[in-house]
Structures are given as structure tokens and as C-alpha cells.
Amino acid sequence: MIELLSIALKHSNIILNSIFIGAFILNLLFAFTIIFMERRSANSIWAWLLVLVFLPLFGFILYLLLGRQIQRDQIFKIDKEDKKGLELIVDEQLAALKNENFSNSNYQIVKFKEMIQMLLYNNAAFLTTDNDLKIYTDGQEKFDDLIQDIRNATDYIHFQYYIIQNDELGRTILNELGKKAEQGVEVKILYDDMGSRGLRKKGLRPFRNKGGHAEAFFPSKLPLINLRMNNRNHRKIVVIDGQIGYVGGFNVGDEYLGKSKKFGYWRDTHLRIVGDAVNALQLRFILDWNSQATRDHISYDDRYFPDVNSGGTIGVQIASSGPDEEWEQIKYGYLKMISSAKKSIYIQSPYFIPDQAFLDSIKIAALGGVDVNIMIPNKPDHPFVFWATLKNAASLLDAGVKVFHYDNGFLHSKTLVIDDEIASVGTANMDHRSFTLNFEVNAFIYDQQIAKKLKQAFIDDLAVSSELTKARYAKRSLWIKFKEGISQLLSPIL
């Protein structure tokens, strides 16, 4: 008996040793990949090395799920002829910027031509100058208008969201889209497989049975694990008949109407656009759809890019970014805006975990006399992200930055307003995930009236916010300091 136990222990030791050796070899291979084969910041490299060293049995699994970088092999493809047409528009606009020769040009477009040129050159974010915009800060108003626009559609509806919940609002929207599909309108839904995991096939069955088409972005090929869970499509885009576009922070679900007991009122920012900027949203949707669709690819014909008579005069660039891009375009757009500030900066972001260079740009602006105001949530939806956000925002207090906690529910708005002149609204948070890992889209707006309206929305929010002063921050408990420290350490991989 003792001899049998001895043999069993010996074999179990051999198995355990084999597991540890195998994990060590895998971690070593992944460490080599992280250091030499991938483009990462030094902070990200060190964070992943710490994970591999201190979690030897699970580090490589975490890396497979959360750390792998996507291959930059043109996920989003456009045929040669259409690419030539897009390049022609970009070249013409670059020449016009150089000569300051823009039709309907306004003061902001001339003043910020370097920023426009940067987004044009590296992101093909062509400038449109004939737009009319409506700003939403309340979910009920936004979805009321969206449903009405869906009901008025006559040709097609292209509908893309990170999250579509299988709840009352989600089913209402899907039902309205299904009705249009039954009427012969082309209706296509693109949803993120991770963000909309509550929807999946069963929730879409009635919509599909009515003739609608739906595709998941980066769907999982395994039942419980998505190996691309780290690269999600966070974009929210709607295009209706090529005439109306929506972009911003609201997802689709009851909680975005303020019906969540956990979060309460949901404060976000979204845009309704009429004008040629809708063509840019359409292009982004087609690229995303065609990259995932197994059938029903969308062509680039004139039907999807009609002339729009908006009567508007607002300048807009639609910029997108993602792990497939060489440059972090939305981040660069934010940085260019911040560096151009002379009077004021207003930032709203639920997740504020930028890199040190980004934080330094804000400090430089504040130390140079710019009035810098940042608003973040006062309740967490992701604990580690919340504590890292708090620590980053508080690190700016000594430079004179004013930081506010939004107390009236949950703040999910992603806005940046500079000097009452230009603004950005979209899906990108001010963190590593939005800048580098996720697929995002933002509208960069060159218009004083829109900038002033967005600034006023921030000021209105101050009535239900509390300032995070240095004295108040200094009183936080040791437990909060500990959570901040751990979250800050993990921030490069959050």
C-alpha cells in the first residue's frame, strides 16, 4: 500500500512539474513576443511581464484572452476604385487647406487647419462643412427621435451598437427595425459579440424572421471564451437613408433610459447629424459590416452616398481608430485640441486612464493659465477602472486642474470642448483601451455654437456634481489608497 502511494505521489509530482515547466516555457515565449514582436508602451510591457511572472500558471491564459494584439492585415477592406475616390477627396482637401480655400469655410476651420490636416492625412477623415447637428444628453429624447427616424425610413437602415440589450428598449427598437424590414426597407444590424452577449441568436430571431440581417463583430468560435475579447467594436453608428446619422455614447438598453437601480440616471452625450458627415458614418459602417458579414456585402454605390441638403454650416470630421490602425487617431485629435487651448478645456469621460504624456499635456495647459475642468463618475461600473480614474484625475489637482464627481447617477459622456470653438463627441473614452485596443469613432466639430452648447451642458451638470479638492482627496482611507495603487499598477492592461 505504501509503495502504491509512493508511486502515485511520484507520478503526481511529475505531472505538476510538467505543468509548471510547460507554463514557464509558454510565459517565456509570450514575454519574448511582448518585448520584441509587438508595438507597446513601456508601461504595457512591464504590466504584462509582471502578470506572466507573478501568475505563472494563469499568466499565459490571461495574455491569450486580454493581451494579444490584433494583426494589422487590413481587417477593413475597400476596393481599389473606391479607395482611389477617397484618396482623391483627401488630396483635394489637403490642397484646399494649404491654400486656405474651403467653400463655406468658417473661422474655426481656418484656425484649426493643422488638426484637420492631421486627421485627413492619417485617417482619411474628410472634412464636411454643411452639417446640422442636434445634441442629446438624455436617453429618452435620443431614443424617441431615433425611433421616429426609423419609422420614417424608406430605403435602408444601418444600425451598429456595442451593446444591444434584450430588454424592453432593446426589443422595442428591434421590433421597429423588423417592421421596416417587412416593408421592404434594407435593415442591417451590426452588434459586438461581447457587448451584446445577452442578445445573440434568440433575441434576434424575430427580427431575422421579418427579413432583417444581423451580424456579430468578432464572434466567438468557442462556447464560453472569446479569444478576441480584448478588441471590441465600441462604435455606435446609425445611418438612415444616407440622410440622417447618429453617433455618440448611448448604447441600446433600459439602463440608458435611467431604469437601472444600480446606476440611476444615465448621463451621456449623442449626436444626430444631417449633412455630408453622414457619408463618413456610412463609410465606417460599410467597412465594419463587410469585414464581418458572411453574405450580403454592401457595395459603395451612389445609393449609399446620396447628396444631402441639410442647409447646415457646421464643420465635422468623423475620425475612427482601432488596433488595425497605425496611428492612435482619436487620441492624437484629443492631444491636438488640448495643446491648442488658450482659455478653457472641458472634459467628460467615464474612464480617465490616459498615458503619462496625455496627463502631462493637460498639466501643461493648466500651468499655462488655461481653465481646465474634468468631470468623472462618482460610482463605479468597473471597480479597477474607477479607482484608476480617480487616481489619474487627482494627480492633476496640484497643476490647478478642477475635477468634479458627477453625483446624479452615472456619467458615460465622452466629450472634449476647447475655448468655446471646437469639440469632440463620440465613443472613445480617455483610456488605453479606447485609444489602442477597441474600435472607436468620434465626431470632431468645428463650430462655436455647438462648442458653447456642450460647454453649457457641462456647466449644467455642475449643479449635481461635487468638486474633488486636494483637501477632500487627502482624507481618503488607506483601503481606498490600496485600491488606487493596485488599479494604477494594472492600468496599462485595463
From Swiss-Prot:
Q: What is its main location?
A: membrane
Membrane-topology descriptor:
Multi-pass membrane protein
Its Gene Ontology molecular function terms? cardiolipin synthase activity
- Identify the catalytic residues: H234, K236, D241, H412, K414, D419
- The organism is Staphylococcus aureus (strain Mu50 / ATCC 700699)
Report the catalytic activity.
2 a 1,2-diacyl-sn-glycero-3-phospho-(1'-sn-glycerol) = a cardiolipin + glycerol
* EC number assigned by the record: 2.7.8.-
Q: Name one GO cellular component term.
A: plasma membrane
Protein name listed in UniProt? Cardiolipin synthase
User: Per UniProt, which keywords does this protein have?
Assistant: Cell membrane, Lipid biosynthesis, Lipid metabolism, Membrane, Phospholipid biosynthesis, Phospholipid metabolism, Repeat, Transferase, Transmembrane, Transmembrane helix
Q: Which family is it part of?
A: Belongs to the phospholipase D family. Cardiolipin synthase subfamily.
State the protein's purpose.
Catalyzes the reversible phosphatidyl group transfer from one phosphatidylglycerol molecule to another to form cardiolipin (CL) (diphosphatidylglycerol) and glycerol.
Membrane-crossing ranges are 14-34, 45-65
The record ties this protein, via Pfam families, to: PLDc_2 (PF13091), PLDc_N (PF13396)
